[in-house]
Amino acid sequence: MEPIITFIIPSIARLTLLRTVESLKNQTDPNWKSIIIYDGVDGPDFNDERITIVKSPKVGLEGHKNGQSGLVRNIGIKESKTPWIGFLDDDDTIHPDYVNKLKNSYNDKDFVVWRMKYENGLVLPPIKENTINFSRVGISFCYKQTLGEILFDNNRDGEDFDFLMKLKKLTNNWSITQEVYYNVRH
């Protein structure tokens, strides 16, 4: 079966990347792939063990010299061919049922904002809040490519929120999950 989602992971080769990729490999539904775009790495010849150890048929590697998270994510967006695009930072993890839940509960939506939990227990957006507000949402979302090529603003604070605002202008068919399936720095 073809992957339904590509996870775009900008990275500076943190040690936490291994844990991030492991959270993908632990998915109960195997229909995913990922592209890790190494920021500050020039060319396809990656020699750092932290970089080469994560490569597999489901995990592609790209390099970009001197980018910012928005620019680096845009490289991944342009490379993605799956129906859905999702985002994951290299020090975060996702719940093992993320892909399965997307496919079976949210596939009729155009984009999904997953509630995220910080190490201190803070959940954003808060459980009773079903709106997207600045500083109360992060990169814990995915969207369908049928909305068109939407890109992040380069080198800008708040690029995650701005991207979500672009999505909201295109569709009213979206959801904030009740599930907390994205873990920040876990």
Task: Give, region by region, the residue ranges found by the protein language model.
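N-proximal low-complexity "stem/linker" segments adjacent to membrane-targeting elements
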Residues: 1-23
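Short, acidic, metal-binding catalytic loop of nucleotide-sugar glycosyltransferases
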Residues: 22-31
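A conserved acidic beta->alpha catalytic loop
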Residues: 30, 36-47, 57-58, 93
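Active-site-proximal specificity loops/subdomain of glycosyltransferases
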Residues: 44-78
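Short aromatic/hydrophobic "clamp" motif used to bind/position activated sugar donors
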Residues: 85
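Acidic donor-binding/catalytic loop of UDP-sugar-dependent glycosyltransferases
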Residues: 92-105
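Short beta-strand-to-loop element that shapes/binds the nucleotide-sugar donor at the catalytic cleft/hinge
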Residues: 112-126
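Conserved nucleotide-sugar donor-binding catalytic segment
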Residues: 129-186
